[in-house]
Regions:
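Carbohydrate-interacting/catalytic domains
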Residues: 2-10, 14-170
């Protein structure tokens, strides 16, 4: 939910995927980084923070309705959610989350603006110890209605994953 509007809280140890609850009497478990699962999560958390700082759509309109729009909110069969984040300069990001263990190929996501969408982060990337079921190429929107929008993109969504797409205008 780091892409959802509002300020972010990273409490001590979150970035390491600590097993133990924080204890003010003990240091963080930096030794965990020698294990691939923890090291890859640390890399993901670093990449996620870099993405947030690099994209004004993820922070400039945090408390204004102009900065957020639900795109998929009621797909209770597939448990996929999607929303758009906007910046004053016209930047558009599409955030997609899959909360179940099903793979979705060609899942239609409504988009607010016609154009080409490039995946900029995906939790299923192999460098984060995922299965690498990602969207390797930019995806051009099609005039295929989905939910309440005239245009949509067809994306591949891995189980229990989250991804963000950036609009590259045509």
């Amino acid at each position: 939910m780091m892409t959802h509007p509002g300020k972010k809280l990273n409490f001590m140890g979150n970035e390491l995927a600590e097993y133990k609850e924080w204890d003010e009497k003990k240091a963080l478990g930096w030794v965990l980084l020698k294990y691939p699962q923890h090291d890859s999560f640390h890399k993901y958390f670093s990449d996620l923070n870099h993405m947030i700082l690099s994209h004004p759509a993820l922070y400039q309109y945090d408390y204004y309705p102009e900065g957020f729009e639900w795109l998929v909110v009621d797909d209770n069969q597939q448990s996929v959610f999607a929303y758009a984040r906007y910046a004053p300069d016209g930047e558009v990001l599409i955030c997609i989350m899959n909360f179940v263990g099903n793979t979705h190929e060609g899942y239609k996501i409504p988009v607010p603006v016609a154009g080409t969408y490039k995946e900029i982060i995906n939790t299923d990337t192999d460098c984060y110890t995922g299965s690498h079921f990602i969207n390797k190429r930019a995806i051009k929107s099609k005039k295929v209605p989905a939910v309440h929008k005239e245009n949509s993109i067809a994306v591949n969504i891995a189980p229990f994953s989250a991804m963000v797409f950036e609009l590259k205008r045509n």
